[in-house]
Amino acid sequence: MGPEKPRAVIAAARANGVGVMGIRAVQAGALTSAIDRPLPDDHPEMRDYRRAEGFRRLAAELQTNPASLAHRYALRLDIDTLVLGVKNRQELVDCVAAAAAGPLPAELVMQIDRSVNRDGD
């Protein structure tokens, strides 16, 4: 599934006066620097992590933390709230800083969309 489907769902919700809540901005760790728990190589979250390698490369090119980039990407969508799912104070500080940095430019959003391998491993 590419970025078009979630955006279509958000647009449909908006058209019907329904609020939208974003969840899993870092995709259970796939859009972070590293998975922080042991998982078997064939676990779905590990497959997602491998698919996001291009996203992490892009974050490195931009000299930013992948999780911060993921949060800024999520905040660029037309949503009412974003569930952060932080595990510690530093992650909360990082999320607040990402929000303070403001929305991503549309060109960067398109670059991120192209960076993620949605076809599999």
Annotate each predicted stretch with a short phrase.
Residues M1-D121:
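Beta/alpha (TIM)-barrel catalytic core signal, keyed to glycine-rich beta->alpha loops juxtaposed to Asp/Glu
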